[in-house]
Amino acid sequence: MDNKIVYVVSDSVGETADLVVRAAMGQFPFAPDIRRVPYVEDTGTLKEVISIAKSNQALICFTLVKPDMRQYLVTEAAKEGVEAYDIIGPLIDQIEEITGQVPRYEPGVVRRLDEEYFKKIEAIEFAVKYDDGRDARGILKADIVLIGVSRTSKTPLSQYLAHNKRLKVANVPLVPEVDPPEELYQVAKEKCFGLKITPDKLNHIRKERLKSLGLSDGATYANINRIQEEIDHFEEVISKINCQVIDVSNKAIEETANIIVNAVQNQKMF
């Protein structure tokens, strides 16, 4: 039984069937010769695989989501005396029976979900790497650039957009004593969003922040005159960039995120 040939047939990449076959074969003392046949779209290919499998006395294991293709392979393989094992079909049928929902019958759904997952991870890592202006090079690489003074929800908003919308977001804090990075004036203004907040609201938020850290709320950080100075600087920078401004004074992060996503979609940037 050494090098028993198994043809793995799929209407997508065939990774699912390959993994299942290897897991099953791992229970036996012989090494399987697994030959993958991916992206099968027609019965002609199935007929050819059956013929080859017959000549090699091989087993066919398959993941085909379309019922007509599954039935063709099972029927024709039986006629030729070839063993064909349906890995995913019975489970799809069982789930349909239990839930009453009709399957989509779309090949490659798992792979597309995997791709979406990795896009999300990439976006999250990007948000962490380019958070709080720690590397200005991220500004030119980002899908979205958030600009604002301290405590305008730049970081949580960046993470929300990464987690839920898979957008790569860089955020830039503005303080009067530090010139904004040059990249801020080089990036397309359509990618930039200024986060505006009223002085009173920011004063309250900063005082609460200081209290949570066990510090006096009388620090310069929460001083209303200092706050106004920062907001004036913010407005000066934003006027040069000429980007969209969102008042986040009384908005939840989800609401601000939706405004940004809608703006991006309207601009047809992606």
UniProtKB/Swiss-Prot annotation:
Where along this sequence does the record place binding of ADP?
Answer: 148-155
Task: Please state the Enzyme Commission number of this protein.
Answer: 2.7.11.32, 2.7.4.27
Cite the InterPro entries for this sequence.
Answer: Kinase-pyrophosphorylase (IPR005177), PPDK_reg (IPR026565)
One GO molecular-function annotation for this sequence?
phosphotransferase activity, phosphate group as acceptor
Q: Which UniProt keywords apply?
A: Kinase, Nucleotide-binding, Serine/threonine-protein kinase, Transferase
**What reaction is this protein's catalytic activity?**
N(tele)-phospho-L-histidyl/L-threonyl-[pyruvate, phosphate dikinase] + ADP = N(tele)-phospho-L-histidyl/O-phospho-L-threonyl-[pyruvate, phosphate dikinase] + AMP + H(+); N(tele)-phospho-L-histidyl/O-phospho-L-threonyl-[pyruvate, phosphate dikinase] + phosphate + H(+) = N(tele)-phospho-L-histidyl/L-threonyl-[pyruvate, phosphate dikinase] + diphosphate
Q: Tell me the superkingdom of the source.
A: Bacteria
Disulfide cross-links: none
Q: What is stated as this protein's family in its record?
A: Belongs to the pyruvate, phosphate/water dikinase regulatory protein family. PDRP subfamily.
Q: What does this protein do?
A: Bifunctional serine/threonine kinase and phosphorylase involved in the regulation of the pyruvate, phosphate dikinase (PPDK) by catalyzing its phosphorylation/dephosphorylation.
Q: Spell out the protein name for this chain.
A: Putative pyruvate, phosphate dikinase regulatory protein
From which source organism is this entry?
Answer: Bacillus cereus (strain B4264)
